Amino acid sequence: MASSLMSNAATTMAAATTTAQANMVAPFNGLKSVSAFPVTRKNNDITSVASNGGRVQCMQVWPPLGKKKFETLSYLPPLSEESLMKEVQYLLNNGWVPCLEFEPTHGFVYREHGNTPGYYDGRYWTMWKLPMFGCTDPSQVVAELEEAKKAYPEAFIRIIGFDNVRQVQCISFIAYKPASYDA
């Protein structure tokens, strides 16, 4: 008797559950038609990419031997005072913290202690004072640059910009090359 009551209750509960589930979830009708999506075919022919009149063979490579280049803007002539102020203003407009670094011997990446990148391969320079937190005027940064040039006239000096929110270096460029360096 007890087993028949139990089976009747289980059957009633299962029927109620199936009805509730059918009302809650829509039935699966299949995927949408493929014809509703636009399809474009890509052409893998490289000749269709060049739009300069077929002069692709005329491009030249910068000679890597005897012409050491460093970082951003190093392929340009030395920055004028006005250009330097504009670069520093760009750095400040983006909310980055300016900082000066100098390297008295090597202004470029080099390998001295092995063939893998490491601490002593020219990537890490000496910081000039502290980062200029709260700096709002490019002339403050240029004044620090002039002070660093007086203290280390034979050093390479670069200006970097840190994003203190993301904690990354966002910009870096050589602001001063020593007179003894022949580019």
Curated annotation (Swiss-Prot):
Pfam families: RbcS, RuBisCO_small. The basic functional RuBisCO is composed of a large chain homodimer in a 'head-to-tail' conformation. In form I RuBisCO this homodimer is arranged in a barrel-like tetramer with the small subunits forming a tetrameric 'cap' on each end of the 'barrel'. RuBisCO catalyzes two reactions: the carboxylation of D-ribulose 1,5-bisphosphate, the primary event in carbon dioxide fixation, as well as the oxidative fragmentation of the pentose substrate. Both reactions occur simultaneously and in competition at the same active site. Although the small subunit is not catalytic it is essential for maximal activity. Heterohexadecamer of 8 large and 8 small subunits. Residues 1-57 form a transit peptide. Belongs to the RuBisCO small chain family. It comes from the Eukaryota. GO terms for biological process: photorespiration; reductive pentose-phosphate cycle. InterPro entries: RuBisCO_ssu, RuBisCO_ssu_dom, RuBisCO_ssu_N, RuBisCO_ssu_sf. The keyword Cell cycle does not apply. One of its GO terms (cellular component) is chloroplast. One of its GO terms (molecular function) is ribulose-bisphosphate carboxylase activity. The lineage of its organism: Eukaryota, Viridiplantae, Streptophyta, Embryophyta, Tracheophyta. It is found in: Plastid, Chloroplast. Keywords: Calvin cycle, Carbon dioxide fixation, Chloroplast, Photorespiration, Photosynthesis, Plastid, Transit peptide. Its main location: plastid. Induction: Expressed at intermediate levels. It comes from Mesembryanthemum crystallinum (Common ice plant). This is Ribulose bisphosphate carboxylase small subunit, chloroplastic 3. PANTHER family: RIBULOSE BISPHOSPHATE CARBOXYLASE SMALL CHAIN 1, CHLOROPLASTIC, RIBULOSE BISPHOSPHATE CARBOXYLASE SMALL SUBUNIT 1A, CHLOROPLASTIC-RELATED.
